[in-house]
UniProtKB/Swiss-Prot annotation:
Modified residues (Phosphothreonine): 10
Keyword NADP: yes
N6-acetyllysine PTM positions: 89, 171, 403, 432, 497
Binding of D-glucose 6-phosphate, residues: 171, 201-205, 239, 258, 360, 365, 395
Protein name, per record: Glucose-6-phosphate 1-dehydrogenase
Residue numbers of N-acetylalanine PTMs: 2
Post-translational modification: Acetylated by ELP3 at Lys-403; acetylation inhibits its homodimerization and enzyme activity. Deacetylated by SIRT2 at Lys-403; deacetylation stimulates its enzyme activity.
Pfam families cross-referenced by the UniProt entry: G6PD_C, G6PD_N
Subunit text: Homotetramer; dimer of dimers. Interacts with SIRT2; the interaction is enhanced by H(2)O(2) treatment. Forms a ternary complex with ALDOB and TP53; this interaction is direct. ALDOB stabilizes the complex inhibiting G6PD activity and keeping oxidative pentose phosphate metabolism in check.
NCBIfam families referenced in this protein's UniProt entry, alphabetically: zwf
PROSITE patterns assigned to the protein according to its UniProt record, in alphabetical order: G6P_DEHYDROGENASE
Native organism: Osphranter robustus (Wallaroo)
UniProt-recorded Gene Ontology molecular function terms: glucose-6-phosphate dehydrogenase activity; NADP binding
Length: 515
């Protein structure tokens, strides 16, 4: 392997800046105002303010950028700083830069359904340097219940008359097809599609974005990426912790709405779609929509639901089940685990099961895409060979590896499982992988919508899952109990085996670089 030249963070950011300023979408000299609606909330504190700080620190924001927080709470910039700065990971050497960052911050308190409050917000923005002609970016870090009032007030009161206006909308985008359509129709009546950025932070993750390059930038994968060679595809999202006392919010949505209908389905689109005409945002999203239109509604026979119970041999949180969370309604049947099988009914993928599996309180933290290939024809090794697999590890320790058979060292002619491995932390030792929110917020400044969800994508995603969700809620389907810290319900493994996935349990990827 060629030796990597060490790059400092300054050098890496310099390359990024050069790339950014080459295009017409990013005008360094323009004034930009980044408005955080819901600035007092957890998302703002833990993700949005830290992300804006990292972009500012690394010189990736336009120079004349202001950050305005807005919420109902009576706060000051000092209050915002105390809440969010612990998540900044700032070093003592960055203190001067940090002071400069907060000098560009301000805060306005107001109601979400009161036009007078938004008039005050607009007056404040106009008072900033070139504020009346600035580009304005509104981040709605808010519960969906206030989206309609907030977007209406933004449109009527706070729009820039000269610069561009863009709105970032956080999931959940509704609870089913009907509520999602209602919300989409409302927002679309106020803003053009090129002003709306529906954010799914998984689309900002390094390995998720890498899926397109792996598929369409490598000749070796093209001829084998189809039903003739691939037996099944598994998308996995596992968390080793439960609801941690915040189950009341989770109980409203459940694991399918929280993870599967968005994160996992978006990854499925990137694996299954045809090659787009270009990397233009709409060309990519057109192909994703085509894939979704080829997927039928989920069948109840292709679903396993689970809910974790306490582990009597565990410690601390592991001893508590989902129903032990005091914020969860008594007797709740909300699933904390789900395994679902989908089929893409087109020429490339006819008959190939796409298995989506996600859950809380499982045995490890992991998100990955696993393509399992068909058995080798004409076996000459007495069934000692296991299926090849291509694995894209999204987290932790981003990696791409191929599980394959090699000869075991020694006197005898025995095959054994091994891997070809690309672990990002080893190959790119001195490159800081950007946080997903860093990529996505920077994309909004640049006007790139490739990694955001379009309205027709959203509609097709809800079409696939809404009948199942309504069936579960109507029938009060009882989830299968599984122990905190386990792999999940054994019935999920049985479902996967039934549709064609072969799990031998003889091999586990070990990070060879001990990150």
């Amino acid at each position: 392997m060629a030796e990597q030249v060490a790059l400092s963070r300054t050098q890496v950011c310099g390359i990024l800046r050069e790339e950014l300023y080459q295009g017409d979408a990013f005008h360094q000299s323009d004034t930009h105002i980044f408005i955080i609606m819901g600035a007092s909330g957890d998302l703002a504190k833990k993700k949005i303010y830290p992300t804006i700080w990292w972009l500012f620190r690394d010189g990736l924001l336009p120079e004349d950028t202001f950050i305005v927080g807005y919420a109902r709470s009576n706060l000051t910039v000092d209050d915002i700083r105390k809440q969010s700065e612990p998540y900044f990971k700032a070093t003592p050497e960055e203190n001067l830069k940090l002071e400069e960052f907060f000098s560009r911050n301000s805060y306005v308190a107001g109601q979400y359904d009161e036009p007078a409050s938004f008039q005050r917000l607009n007056a404040h923005m106009n008072s900033l340097h070139h504020g009346s002609q600035a580009n304005r970016l509104f981040y709605l870090a808010l519960p969906p219940t206030v989206y309609e009032a907030v977007t209406k007030n933004i449109k009527e009161t706070c729009m820039s008359q000269i610069g561009w206006n863009r709105v970032i909308v956080e999931k959940p985008f509704g609870k089913d097809l009907q509520s999602s359509d209602k919300l989409s129709n409302h927002i679309s009546s106020l803003f053009h599609e090129d002003q709306i950025y529906r954010i799914d932070h998984y689309l900002g993750k390094e390995m998720v974005q890498n899926l397109m390059v792996l598929r369409f930038g490598n000749r070796i994968f093209g001829p084998i990426w189809n039903r003739d060679n691939i037996a099944c595809v598994i998308f996995t999202f596992k968390e080793p912790f439960g609801t941690l006392g915040r189950g009341g919010y989770f109980d409203e949505f459940g694991i399918i709405r929280d993870v599967m209908q968005n994160h996992l389905l978006q990854m499925l689109c990137l694996v299954a779609m045809e090659k787009p005409a270009s990397t233009n945002s709409d060309d990519v999203r057109d192909e994703k929509v085509k894939v979704l239109k080829c997927i039928s509604e989920v069948r109840a026979t292709d679903v396993v639901l689970g809910q974790y119970v306490g582990n009597p041999d565990g410690e601390g949180e592991a001893t508590k089940g989902y129903l032990d969370d005091p914020t969860v309604p008594r007797g709740s049947t909300t699933a904390t685990f789900a395994a679902v099988v989908l089929y893409v009914e087109n020429e490339r993928w006819d008959g190939v099961p796409f298995i989506l599996r996600c859950g809380k309180a499982l045995n490890e933290r992991k998100a990955e895409v696993r393509l399992q290939f068909r058995d080798v024809a004409g076996d000459i090794f007495q069934r000692q060979c296991k299926r090849n697999e291509l694995v894209i590890r999204v987290q932790p320790n981003e990696a791409v590896y191929t599980k394959m058979m090699t000869k075991k060292p020694g006197m005898f002619f025995n095959p054994e499982e091994s891997e070809l491995d690309l672990t990002y932390g080893n190959r790119y030792k001195d490159v800081k992988l950007p946080d997903a929110y860093e990529r996505l917020i920077l994309d909004v400044f640049c006007g790139s919508q490739m990694h955001f969800v379009r309205s027709d994508e959203l509609r097709e995603a809800w079409r696939i899952f809404t009948p199942l969700l309504h069936h579960i809620e109507k029938e009060k389907t009882q989830p299968i109990a599984y122990v905190y810290g386990s792999r999940g319900p054994p019935e999920a493994d049985e479902l996967m085996k039934r549709v064609g996935f072969q799990y031998e349990g003889t091999y586990k990827w070990v990070n060879p670089h001990k990150l």
